[in-house]
C-alpha cells in the first residue's frame, strides 16, 4: 500500500528548494507553503486511491498491441482521464494553454508521488510533460496553440520514440530522419523497436 510522504516533501520544498523564495517570483505569489500543502494533500489522495491500486494489476494484465490496436492495462485509461480532468497534467504548465501555472517545485513533488505510486502509469504523464516542454521551448506559436491545450486536457499524450534496431538507445547511431513536406508536415524515415507509451 502506497502512502505519500507529504510531510517530507513539504519539508524539502521549504528547507531545500526554497519555496518561500520561489513564491516571491512574479506569477508565483500564490504558490507558497499553504498552497503547496493543499496541492500535495490532494495529489497524495489521488495517487493513493487511484494510481497506486493499478500498480499490481498493471503488472499482471499489461498493455498489448494486437491487430494494430493498442490496449493499456485495465484502469489506466480511466486513471489518466481522471488525472487530466483533475488538472494534474497541467499543474506546472502555463495558464494560457489551460494549465495551472504553478512552479515546477510543486509539480515535481506531485510527480514524485505518481512515480512512486506506479512507475508504469507515470510514464504517460512524464512523456506528455516532455512533449509540452519541447513545444514551449522550441515550438512556434501555431504549434503551441494547436498541441499544448490538447496535451494538458488529456486528449493527446506524448511518447518516447528512441530505440532503433541498429542503435539501441545510442542517439549518435540513430538513423531516423524527418524530411519537411510542402504542406508544413514532416515525413519520417526509419525504424523504432520500442515506443514508450506508444
What residue spans do the PLM features occupy?
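Amphipathic, small/basic residue-rich leader segments at the start of a protein or domain
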Residues: 1-123, 142, 146
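Short, well-ordered loop/turn and helix-capping segments at boundaries between secondary-structure elements
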Residues: 18-19, 116, 133-141, 153, ...
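A glycine-rich phosphate-binding loop feature that marks nucleotide/adenosyl-phosphate handling sites
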Residues: 64, 128-131, 153, 164-166
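N-terminal glycine-rich flavin-associated loop
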Residues: 123-141, 168
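Glycine-rich, Trp-frequent "lid" loop and neighboring beta-strands that shape
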Residues: 92, 100, 142-198
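Short, mixed-charge aromatic SLiMs
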Residues: 66-75, 137, 154-159
Amino acid at each position: 500500500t502506497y502512502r505519500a510522504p507529504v510531510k517530507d516533501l513539504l519539508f524539502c520544498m521549504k528547507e531545500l528548494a526554497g519555496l518561500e523564495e520561489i513564491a516571491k517570483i512574479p506569477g508565483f505569489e500564490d504558490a507558497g507553503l499553504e498552497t503547496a500543502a493543499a496541492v500535495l494533500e490532494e495529489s497524495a489522495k489521488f495517487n493513493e486511491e487511484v494510481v497506486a491500486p493499478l500498480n499490481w494489476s498493471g503488472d499482471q494484465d499489461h498493455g498489448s498491441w494486437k491487430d494494430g490496436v493498442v490496449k493499456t492495462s485495465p484502469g489506466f485509461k480511466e486513471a489518466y482521464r481522471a488525472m487530466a480532468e483533475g488538472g494534474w497534467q497541467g499543474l506546472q504548465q502555463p495558464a494560457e494553454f489551460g494549465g495551472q501555472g504553478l512552479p515546477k517545485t510543486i509539480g515535481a513533488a506531485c510527480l514524485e508521488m505518481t512515480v512512486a505510486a506506479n512507475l508504469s502509469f507515470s510514464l504517460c504523464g512524464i512523456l506528455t510533460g516532455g512533449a509540452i516542454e519541447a513545444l514551449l521551448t522550441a515550438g512556434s506559436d501555431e504549434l503551441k496553440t494547436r498541441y499544448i491545450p490538447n496535451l494538458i486536457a488529456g486528449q493527446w499524450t506524448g511518447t518516447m520514440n528512441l530505440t532503433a534496431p541498429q542503435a539501441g538507445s545510442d542517439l549518435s547511431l540513430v538513423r531516423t530522419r524527418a524530411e519537411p513536406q510542402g504542406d508544413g508536415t514532416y515525413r519520417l524515415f526509419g525504424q523504432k523497436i520500442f515506443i514508450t507509451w506508444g
